[in-house]
Amino acid sequence: MALLPILSYPDPRLRMIATPVKEVTAEIKTLITDMIETMYDAEGIGLAASQVDHHIQLIVMDLSEDKDSPRVFINPKVTPLVEEKQPYEEGCLSVPDVYDKVERPNKVRIEAIDQNGNAIDEEVEGLLAVCIQHEIDHLNGVIFVDYLSRLKQTRARDKVRKVLKIREKQGEQVAEKEPQPANS
């Protein structure tokens, strides 16, 4: 198991269109495990393979309180079941510390396969429906800030840059404080 680096907005790789998974191989299963571990470590509820620079149609999510019920959707297809859209406040691991309302259908049908090749065909609503649509957007090169005004997109980009600089400095400070090995 390994933590994977998460791409940050506005990295152009986030705009790449994911290709379908032809077969659930051992490598795909390892990627799934690593994505779930990465999602938990980053305290997220969903992660698309595109966000970790693997441009295949694969998403993982876990909306459970105890973070013990991960779901895997391979080659997901979503169909809205209602015309009306509802606003939900969304955030994204690729757009750290930025949250804003996005309107999406509250009820959808999700068709996919799981990590064992079993078919998934479910009607879902609420946060699960929103999360699935958000992650599928990533597979299509769409980021939630694309739904926002130009001004909010610019603010999001600036905020992400600041957050990443702060994290980089904190990482350097942590590295400086770690004990250095003694010369023998």
UniProtKB/Swiss-Prot annotation:
One biological process term in Gene Ontology: translation
Record-given protein name: Peptide deformylase
Family of the protein in this entry: Belongs to the polypeptide deformylase family.
Cited function: Removes the formyl group from the N-terminal Met of newly synthesized proteins. Requires at least a dipeptide for an efficient rate of reaction. N-terminal L-methionine is a prerequisite for activity but the enzyme has broad specificity at other positions.
Alphabetized UniProt keyword annotations: Hydrolase, Iron, Metal-binding, Protein biosynthesis
Cofactor or coenzyme needed: Fe(2+)
UniProt-listed Enzyme Commission number(s): 3.5.1.88
CDD domains (alphabetical): Pep_deformylase (cd00487)
Cofactor note: Binds 1 Fe(2+) ion.
Catalytic residues of the enzyme: 135
Organism (species): Psychrobacter arcticus (strain DSM 17307 / VKM B-2377 / 273-4)
